[in-house]
UniProtKB/Swiss-Prot annotation:
It holds the Pfam family VRP1. Belongs to the SpvA family. It comes from the Bacteria. InterPro entries: Insecticidal_toxin/plasmid_vir, Sal_SpvA. This is 28.1 kDa virulence protein. Not known. This protein is involved in the virulence of salmonellas. Keywords: Plasmid, Virulence.
Amino acid sequence: MNMNQTTSPALSQVETAIRVPAGNFAKYNYYSVFDIVRQTRKQFINANMSWPGSRGGKAWDLAMGQAQYIRCMFRENQLTRRVRGTLQQTPDNGTNLSSSAVGGIQGQAERRPDLATLMVVNDAINQQIPTLLPYHFPHDQVELSLLNTDVSLEDIISESSIDWPWFLSNSLTGDNSNYAMELASRLSPEQQTLPTEPDNSTATDLTSFYQTNLGLKTADYTPFEALNTFARQLAITVPPGGTVDCGYSACQPAV
């Protein structure tokens, strides 16, 4: 800059704030607030003790505030120009979009008809329900910890147990061999009960079967022919107009 340059508006505000004559900074080669903040606060005060005196610190603080504001405005304008330039490259405002698929859109009332009956309570909002049931938290944590490794829990146990494996011969069956197979299955304890629970679907009296699996004491499947009853006992939501096959093949246990 040269002496013919005028003081910037931001620096003029600093002059007004500290009550010095207009253009006084320019006499000392300060034409903008950036000329001031190029120096540290201490350097500026020491270099200008003769004329602003005790107001030098306040002048530097005001100049720093103005400089920060100008930087923010400059960056904001840059970002605005970039966004506008990007939008101009995609001038389509939606008028060219096809409306042929609008008729096939399912509204929220169809997708979640149960929303209208839900209560806004703490359990409904904050209760965490696993997406895969039955769920076992400790087993899930172990599986997650081994997710990015090349070894399974069975492999880790086999390397650390001196009597592994227990199921090499028929004579080594028992609790230990069952434990080994449980580890190898990679199923949680709740999942392991599904294939090992007693089969109660082949009895002559199926009351116990329906009581255990569908929560209704009945000797046959006829109560579940009513869709509302079937959906309620399974805790499922049926969309409006939906149907569930509740004939013999759906509700009667396979023999």
